[in-house]
Amino acid sequence: GGAEYALMTLLLDHHCLKFERQDLLEQDIIRTRSALQFQKKHLDRAMDRKVHIYRILDSRREHFKLGIPYQKRVSKIEALYTRPEIEILYIINEGKYETFKKGNTRPHEYVRRQLANMPKGNIKSKDYVTAYWEPQLERLIETIREYARMTPDPFEQTLAAILK
């Protein structure tokens, strides 16, 4: 989604990831969810090396199965989860994770209702995410690492796994 794209762009542009923009296919973050569309759009041309795919997801239900002819062009496909939702990073950053856990509210609803001190706006928009996190980039990195410690997902399936 837009929030994930904005976060990844921030981390990439500030050299916080294990890879740089020039390492990326087309030197950009690709927002294609469908394996069929991805292979047609990005793997249909001759390439001098295999591609490593990172997928940023908030659900384990999404499947990404490349066709057999395209599988040989990919070295690995890794899913990185921001479950239950990317808004969990706001909740952790604002020091409200324990309170959030006690309730029964989705993260985006919790942020909207309980974090009144946060700037108003669409918390999932690229502009909002950039305006909120860019001035506190070190805090974003700390929050991603903190989330990796809290989540039941294995470390290698969190955004922290691709941080420098």
What are these regions (language model features)?
Residues 5-25, 38-164:
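C-terminal accessory helical subdomains adjacent to catalytic cores in phosphodiester-
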Residues 30-40:
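N-terminal beta-loop-helix "entrance" segment that forms/cooperates
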